[in-house]
A protein has these predicted regions:
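N-terminal leader segment of winged-helix/HTH proteins
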Residues: 1-54
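Short, locally clustered residues in the helix-turn-helix/winged-helix DNA-binding domain
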Residues: 36, 40, 65-71, 133, ...
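Residues within the DNA-recognition helix of helix-turn-helix
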Residues: 93-96, 158
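Pre-recognition alpha-helix immediately N-terminal to the DNA-recognition helix
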Residues: 30, 34, 45, 62-65, ...
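Exposed, interaction-prone assembly regions rather than primary DNA-binding/catalytic cores
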Residues: 150-166
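Charged, amphipathic alpha-helical coiled-coil/dimerization segments
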Residues: 95-153
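N-terminal helix-turn-helix DNA-binding core of bacterial DNA-binding proteins
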Residues: 26, 44-86
Length: 166
């Protein structure tokens, strides 16, 4: 991924000057631009490598991790909520994981509500996920090593605060 050229604070002052933007507003714009850039870098370096190594997208990895963590069949709707995507998106992911040579998930009818599907991890899904977890964890850990432990904790607290109301 080519490195995105980020505007300087002076560039932002010039471009937002006509709006009578305060220094705090300009800093907010710069913050959002760097958060977007950080997200792009994480997606490429962490999830791009995961996809190249395993064929798993960020969404499929999240879905498999939820199933792995819960260790029992989960209603499709609950998976959607936990991943943060629509039921139709989750349904498409599940369908694609059912269509692999060795299906990564199993889909059964909920015995309590026949209109609902339950999704569970297959042995093939578990093997793929377990083989991916250590390299993925190491990539994430290596990426975060740029920051000290204290900086990481501060950033976590600030990001939680930033997203709490949204």
């Amino acid at each position: 991924m080519p490195k995105r050229l980020m505007p300087t604070r002076d560039n932002l002052r010039r471009s937002h000057g006509a709006l009578n933007a305060s220094e705090n507003d300009i800093a907010g714009v710069e913050l959002m631009l760097y958060l977007i850039r950080a997200s792009d870098v994480i997606r490429e370096e962490i999830y791009g490598a995961l996809r190249r190594d395993t064929g798993l997208t960020e969404g499929k990895f999240a879905l498999l991790m939820i199933l792995y963590d819960i260790s029992e069949p989960v209603p499709l709707v609950e998976l959607s909520v936990r991943i943060g995507v629509s039921s139709s998106t989750t349904s498409i992911m599940v369908t694609r994981m059912l269509q692999t040579e060795e299906p990564l998930v199993a889909k059964t009818v909920d015995p309590v509500d026949a209109r609902s599907a339950l999704i569970s991890l297959t042995p093939a899904g578990r093997r793929l996920l377990e083989s991916a977890m250590l390299p993925h964890f190491n990539r994430v850990s290596d990426f975060a090593k740029t920051l000290s432990s204290a900086e990481r904790e501060t950033m976590i607290a600030l990001l939680k605060k930033l997203v709490a109301g949204h």
